[in-house]
């Protein structure tokens, strides 16, 4: 009985078989029609646009920040200059020094001793609160007028006092203040009711004893003097 002889393949046949297996195991790739390159180019352009917009926005924000810092620096420099100038003006020599911040100050405006004629006549002044004259609408008079009025009043007051000195300040009969005073021919003053009662007793004047005949007239002068006092 004879055995079957197995013939081994050559190296070339083995290499071919491995190549066929590799081709069979790989998937079939689609053919490139050129659209892939166009899409990639479009995506790249969009990315470039976004990058440019971002850089422009970032550059604009940086410029705005620089401008803001420049303005803040300018304002700060102005405040420093004003503070230095204010301190220089407030600095005085001698015993009087600038007032501390925790102290309360009161400002008194010393007006020129004249009255604003426009405000006195019309109630309006174009200078407003900066006017150096006093805004007042009270009745005023010049110095010479005041002195004249004072002299007149003083003279009249002296005359009244002199006349009152000559007249008793109370009724001679009732020892009280005059009520409806009357005067006799001998220039003696009494209350009307007191004089009428005395005339029932005697017609002679109670002070000097002269005959009055029971007649007396109203003392208008004394009444005016009593009203002034």
From Swiss-Prot:
Keywords: DNA-binding, Metal-binding, mRNA processing, mRNA splicing, Nucleus, Spliceosome, Zinc, Zinc-finger. Its main location: nucleus. Residues 1-43 are annotated as: Disordered. The keyword Cell inner membrane does not apply. Belongs to the CWC24 family. SMART domains: RING, ZnF_C3H1. A zinc finger (RING-type) spans 171-209. This is Pre-mRNA-splicing factor CWC24. Involved in pre-mRNA splicing. Associated with the spliceosome. One of its GO terms (molecular function) is zinc ion binding. GO terms for biological process: mRNA processing; snoRNA splicing. Residues 1-17 have a biased composition (Basic residues). It comes from Kluyveromyces lactis (strain ATCC 8585 / CBS 2359 / DSM 70799 / NBRC 1267 / NRRL Y-1140 / WM37) (Yeast). InterPro entries: CWC24-like, Znf_CCCH, Znf_CCCH_sf, Znf_RING, Znf_RING/FYVE/PHD. A zinc finger (C3H1-type) spans 110-138.
